[in-house]
A protein has these predicted regions:
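Post-signal peptide N-terminal regions of Sec-secreted extracellular proteins
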Residues: 31-148
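N-terminal prepro-regions of secreted/extracellular proteins
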Residues: 1-52
Length: 148
């Protein structure tokens, strides 16, 4: 469907009336080269093994690669936090990680990381203190892979 729209963006249709008058039926003003259509993939929820922390999110294409974003929820007790760890494989064959925490116990925390061009991404949710992950982690869940 998107490739069909790209073809139509550069075309102008005309309708010929009975008296030989040609009237433009529609005119597409945007060209395919000036328009950038971002794609979005959703993932989650991924939960810690005690189900007191979970994360959901999306991966969105940008002009400089991909962006992984989402919300981290914390339903744990006092002095505990939920952590989400994102791991991705770059197009250069290197693994990178980003870690985010939420200690609010009531409000989801938004997170976002620009990954650039990547081959795959995984996420896991853990429990911990305000300074480090202590355990009760989910397994690595594949959230995005190039080619499906």
């Amino acid at each position: 469907m998107r490739s069909g729209l790209r073809v139509l963006l550069g075309l102008t249709a005309t309708v010929t009336l009975g008296a030989g008058i040609v009237v433009p039926a529609f005119t597409a003003s945007a060209s395919a080269s000036s328009t950038y259509a971002a794609e979005t993939w959703h993932w989650g929820p991924t939960a810690s093994t005690d189900y007191k922390g979970w994360a959901t999110g999306k991966i969105r294409s940008t002009s400089s690669g991909l962006r992984v974003s989402g919300d981290l929820y914390d339903a744990g007790g006092a002095r505990t936090c939920s952590w989400v760890k994102i791991k991705w494989l770059t197009d250069h064959g290197r693994y990178r990680t980003a870690t985010f925490k939420n200690c609010s116990q009531s409000t989801p925390r938004a997170f976002s990381v620009n990954t650039g061009y990547m081959l795959s991404a995984e996420a896991k949710v853990c429990r911990g203190t305000s300074t480090r992950i202590t355990g009760r982690c989910s397994g690595w869940e594949g959230v995005w892979s190039q080619g499906g």
